Curated annotation (Swiss-Prot):
Example of a GO biological process term: translation
Family matches, as NCBIfam families: rplN_bact
Function: Binds to 23S rRNA.
Protein name as catalogued: Large ribosomal subunit protein uL14c
Family indicated by similarity: Belongs to the universal ribosomal protein uL14 family.
InterPro entries, per the entry: Ribosomal_uL14, Ribosomal_uL14_bac-type, Ribosomal_uL14_CS, Ribosomal_uL14_sf
SUPFAM superfamilies linked: Ribosomal protein L14
Gene: rpl14
Length: 121
């Protein structure tokens, strides 16, 4: 469950390392889960890359510590909360994605991120 003021890791090579959620997009949404789009501010960034510190960006949640319940009854839980920074067309701003991501992103229309990921669980 991601809510405003939650700090997340960034799982791509766009230049940001840490992101703080300031809004979960959707009508009156309080919590975000895997596959939800958030608005966040970059808290830590690598110098000389496309995303700078204090930039306001859109991102999609790819991993959460809160377990994901699947239709078959199984549960999936990750070690960290992570996002991938996206543009207005829901395409990733980076060219690589690090770490595993959940299969639920494919159902939400983020096929480009799924194709870049090294492992889909």
């Amino acid at each position: 469950m991601i809510q405003p003021q939650t700090c997340l890791n960034v799982a791509d090579n766009s230049g940001a390392k840490k992101l703080m959620c300031i809004r979960v997009l959707g009508t009156n949404r309080r919590y975000g889960h895997v596959g939800d789009v958030i608005i966040g501010v970059v808290k830590d960034a690598t110098p000389n890359l496309t995303v700078k510190r204090s930039d306001v960006v859109r991102a999609v949640i790819v991993r959460t510590k809160q377990s994901i319940r699947r239709k078959d009854g199984s549960r999936l839980r990750f070690d960290d909360n992570a996002t991938v920074i996206i543009n207005k067309e829901n395409n990733p701003r980076g060219t690589r994605v690090f770490g595993p991501i959940a299969r639920e992103l494919k159902d939400n229309g983020f096929t480009k991120i799924v194709s870049l990921a090294p492992e889909v669980l």
